[in-house]
Amino acid sequence: MPVNIKQLAQEFDKKEIGITQGHRLCPGCGAPITVKFVMMIARHLGYEPVVGLATGCLEVSTSIYPYTAWSVPYIHNAFENVAATMSGVETAYKALKNKGKIPEDKKYAFIAFGGDGGTYDIGLQSLSGMLERGHKVLYVLYDNEGYMNTGNQRSGSTPPGSDTTTAPVGKKLPGKVQLKKNIVEIVAAHENVYAATASLSEPMDFFAKVEKALNFDGPSFLAVFSPCVRFWRVNDDKTVEISKLAVETKYWPLYEVERGVYRVTRKPRQFKPVEEFLKAQGRFRKLLSRPDAKEIVDELQEYVDRRWERLLTLEEVTKDKPIR
């Protein structure tokens, strides 16, 4: 049954969802909105959330000793091992439940939050292990496309042409030249999983995917497009607008993969050119001022077009053909 936004707003108007005001994340940051969306649905479905936090913007800004913005059990571990940590928590829960030490009617949701640095790169091995072993954990990636907590270094998620401190736009190179990793396909390759993309500009799609992920009998993964206003150089009231542009330009297609079956969940009737997405952000300003800017933008447009067509093909050929 689809989640009703008005009902959610009324339900959580005065009810605690797990993260409170007073955290130190930047105004306009996509991460706390992501957390609130996920926690609201978990609570709405009757789950008690247990949270793991990889080192990163979200962790350092919500749990600076001796303060915390969390009102649910949470664990801060290292940069690279939140998936491994939550695998252990989920396994301990099952052991205690088998011994009768946890009531049968008590529902827990084990949720790991990590940024792109701790997911695409540093934590990829522990994430893969969690998926392969089949732990019932929801891993939520807030993807701000760089190591933003430490000052905007490039990551495996940083797109071509983005200006970062470790891959700056200069005379010889137009910023980062490598393509962004396709993390959802990497996760989906583990086969018996649920993996999806989400955008803050599409809350109903977001909520539906969180519900499906939490109720999935196995590991689940949600990649959320999470603008960083500080290093993307956008105004703090543009978070949702940038997120919407990402969807409308095919830069961030919305889809899900359930046990190998692809489904595109948003198909805009008309797409905007990817250049509109680039022009809306200061991190691409130097790229767009280069003499070869048109050539680079055209290449990126061709790439997102091809990727979109590939997604539609995968949706067609995997329809009704789950791995298991």
From Swiss-Prot:
It comes from the Bacteria. Residues 150-172 are annotated as: Disordered. The keyword Iron-sulfur applies. Its EC number is 1.2.7.1. SUPFAM superfamilies: Thiamin diphosphate-binding fold (THDP-binding) (SSF52518). InterPro entries: PorB-like, THDP-binding, TPP_enzyme_TPP-bd. It catalyses: 2 oxidized [2Fe-2S]-[ferredoxin] + pyruvate + CoA = 2 reduced [2Fe-2S]-[ferredoxin] + acetyl-CoA + CO2 + H(+). Its cofactor is [4Fe-4S] cluster. This is Pyruvate synthase subunit PorB.
